[in-house]
Amino acid sequence: MAAEGRVQRVASELQKVISLLLRTKIKDSKLATATITEVELSKDLSYAKVYYTCLDIQEAQYISKAFEKSKGFFRSSIAKSLNLRIVPNLKFVYDKSLDYGMEMEGKIQQALEADSKIIKQDDNSLQENYKDSDKETKVEKLR
């Protein structure tokens, strides 16, 4: 249990350090636009999957290659920042959850629009039915 807590703490620190490096030390403006969303660390702290996302999907492939080229820089900077016996091997993975979330949001918006159209149609038909029944009531009163 204690080891899991340490793994999570180190993963959190790795995320902070890599994010800080992206903001302050990376000169590649496209790579600097990437956001680190999560870091998964192996139990022995030797491997880390670093999940990232970027606002421009067309830049994802470029950013992936840039991360691969910059692995050594990130590892050496992590070694200087964190007091770890072993600096984990980094694997950068594009995080598709943001894209998936935006896709789901679009589908929800479409469903809400379709529902509002149906509700408007139902309201209109109810109003027409009410008007028709109101006319019939008036005619019956006249008889």
Curated annotation (Swiss-Prot):
Keywords: Cytoplasm, Ribosome biogenesis. It holds the Pfam family RBFA. GO terms for molecular function: ribosomal small subunit binding. Disulfide bonds: none annotated. GO terms for biological process: maturation of SSU-rRNA. Transmembrane segments: none annotated. It is found in: Cytoplasm. Residues 123-143 are annotated as: Disordered. GO terms for cellular component: cytosol. InterPro entries: KH_dom-like_a/b, RbfA, RbfA_dom_sf, Ribosome-bd_factorA_CS. PANTHER family: RIBOSOME-BINDING FACTOR A, CHLOROPLASTIC-RELATED (PTHR33515:SF1). One of several proteins that assist in the late maturation steps of the functional core of the 30S ribosomal subunit. Associates with free 30S ribosomal subunits (but not with 30S subunits that are part of 70S ribosomes or polysomes). Required for efficient processing of 16S rRNA. May interact with the 5'-terminal helix region of 16S rRNA. Monomer. Binds 30S ribosomal subunits, but not 50S ribosomal subunits or 70S ribosomes. Belongs to the RbfA family. This is Ribosome-binding factor A. It comes from Francisella philomiragia subsp. philomiragia (strain ATCC 25017 / CCUG 19701 / FSC 153 / O#319-036). The gene is rbfA.
